[in-house]
Amino acid sequence: VRQASALPERERRRGLAVLLVTTFLSWGGFFAVVPLISVHFVDDIGWSAASVGLVLAVRQFLQQGSSSLTGAIADRIGPKPLMCFGMFVRAISFLVLAAAGSYATVMLAAVLMALGGGFFESPQAAATAALTTPADRRRFYALNGTIGGLGTSLGTQLGALLIDSNFATVSMIGAVAFGTIFIVMLVFMPSISVSIGNQGAWSGLRLAVNDRLFVGFNVLLMGFWFMYTQFSISLPLAAKDISGDTSSVAWVYGVNSGVTILLGYLLPRMLERRMGNFPMLVAGIALTAVGMMAIGLVDSLSMLLFCVFVLSLGMVLSRPSQQTISAGLARPDALGAFLGVGALSLAIGGGIGNFTGGVIYDVGKSHDLHWLPWLIFGTIGLLAAVGLSFFRPRFERRHEELSRLSDEVHQT
């Protein structure tokens, strides 16, 4: 196990290439299945949106919650063994989902899916931050998002194509994708260390939890993740309700993926000289919120897709900036622990978003208040944008200080 900064350039690039392949296959496999869980079990099986939202919330909370610990462990043993194990468990989870015939079995699949994701998510984020330099980090995150968008597009189209015949077949696609990642990562991913110090797992976690600025940033991000997770629960249901056709879910994800593929790399590159990371993050979250609110006013699939286009632009702006800032605010001597603690933002915000999103959607639908869920989702996002804008000077000073330190590490 070697320091990432000490790797020869060829090995560093190979590691980044493996991470891009991982992103493509993991997003493709995940989004071939997960968006259709709500459609399949709510519309085809007859479960309530709240019950399915609880399954997705458990998956979200357990995954990001366990990421805190695995991120800290990655500081000690390196990210590769954790990522490999996580991909293997995630593949098993989709096999369980394919055979699921009861609510308990679906919940078991969600728990396994969460544990698998918990083992690879923070270690993968730490590996990405360690293998990139501050100068090229945002560009890599933008490229990574574009690759992920391509995987999402292909995955959702394949899932929509197969969902009418057999949900189990769709789940098997997810299992194959993550099984392939396990093999690729085991063979080609270099073994690296992501921390420059000798912090123990628990001491690294204590540093992260006690860092008020880092924690404050991630608390504010919870509002963004609350909105973001509606892609897994409320948006597929809205597409089906508005159009009356399950295949419309693929159109929603197709628009989102198309924006990500075509603009996910180019738009941040065009704006990076005019806008810093924080203005781009705030603008992206605000635009996503506006797109969410507008969904409550539409009554046709074409208008829904336009709203998806707007909020997808917001996500294209916000996601690379959010990842860059999170990595920049993390201390290099406990990188995995910091990014693991940062994952709690998605665990809490996303978990609440999945469960309450399903509940609020049910309430809005039963009382003929279709605009209500989207007004709530968008308002929460706008509050997050306002909070981030207010504390921006403090975050920027810290980001600049740690970026200089990270530059020094890569140069030595």
Regions found by a protein language model. Name each.
Residues 1-13, 190-220, 408-412:
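Juxtamembrane intracellular "pre-TM" segments in multi-pass secondary transporters
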Residues 35-50, 233-248:
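Short amphipathic helix-loop junctions that connect adjacent transmembrane helices
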Residues 60-68, 152-153, 257-265, 350-351:
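Residue-level signature of mid-helix packing/kink "hotspots" within the transmembrane helices
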Residues 66-78, 263-276, 361:
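Helix-to-loop junctions at the C-terminal end of transmembrane segments
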Residues 81-95, 279-293:
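Structural signature of the two symmetry-related core transmembrane helices
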Residues 110-149:
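Cytoplasmic helix-loop-helix junction between adjacent transmembrane helices
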Residues 163-176, 359-381:
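A membrane-interface helix-boundary motif in multi-pass transporters
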Residues 181-189, 376-412:
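Multi-pass alpha-helical transporter architecture, strongest
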